[in-house]
């Protein structure tokens, strides 16, 4: 798969049931869109919890062989990533960090580790991102990803290992 000990003191480990409160809080922190709904606080929290469960179940249906990891730094949980190591690609399904760990280069470290895994397996590394998430798109492009499908609301981005660039056409 990929090395679980990375640059910057980051460690990636498989998530487990004890991580559920952290994962729920992390998901909650990414759903500012739902926090502005005109409804009671309890209703919004319940809605976010339902969305969290639906996301996890949806990933399970769409990517039944996916792996779910917690990202730690100095034994503190700072993020999560879901990855599908398929036969024809390595797919980043989801990646997110707590607010205190954002914009510190940790995402680049994790993605570069996945690029190494894709390179070793001679397959592309792919992901989708919302068009509205311009900072993420800019980061991915800086890391060598190209937009290969641009259907709303998501863009499909792909990074190709050196050994694959001649076999794939990327615009």
What is the meaning of each model-derived region?
Residues 133:
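Conserved HGGG/HGGXW glycine-rich cap/lid loop of the alpha/beta-hydrolase fold
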Residues 103-116, 138-142:
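Conserved acetyl-CoA-binding loop-helix of GNAT-fold acetyltransferases
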Residues 1-3:
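A detector for short, charged/polar N-terminal pre-domain segments
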Residues 5-6, 17-20, 24-93, 98-99, ...:
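Acetyl-CoA-dependent GNAT
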């Amino acid at each position: 798969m990929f090395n679980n000990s990375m640059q910057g003191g980051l460690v990636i480990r498989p998530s487990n049931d004890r991580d559920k409160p952290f994962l729920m809080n992390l998901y909650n922190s990414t759903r500012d869109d739902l926090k502005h709904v005109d409804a009671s606080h309890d209703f919004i929290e319940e809605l976010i919890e339902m969305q969290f469960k639906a996301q996890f179940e949806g990933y399970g249906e769409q990517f039944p062989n996916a792996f779910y990891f917690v990202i730690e730094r100095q034994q503190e949980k700072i993020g999560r990533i879901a990855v599908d190591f398929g036969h024809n690609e390595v797919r980043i399904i989801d990646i997110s960090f707590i607010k205190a760990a954002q914009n510190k280069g940790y995402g680049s470290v994790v993605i570069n580790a996945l690029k190494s895994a894709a390179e070793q397996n001679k397959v592309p590394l792919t992901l989708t991102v919302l068009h509205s998430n311009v900072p993420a798109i800019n980061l991915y492009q800086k890391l060598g990803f190209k937009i290969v499908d641009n259907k709303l609301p998501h863009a499909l981005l792909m990074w190709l290992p050196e050994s694959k660039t001649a076999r794939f056409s990327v615009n």
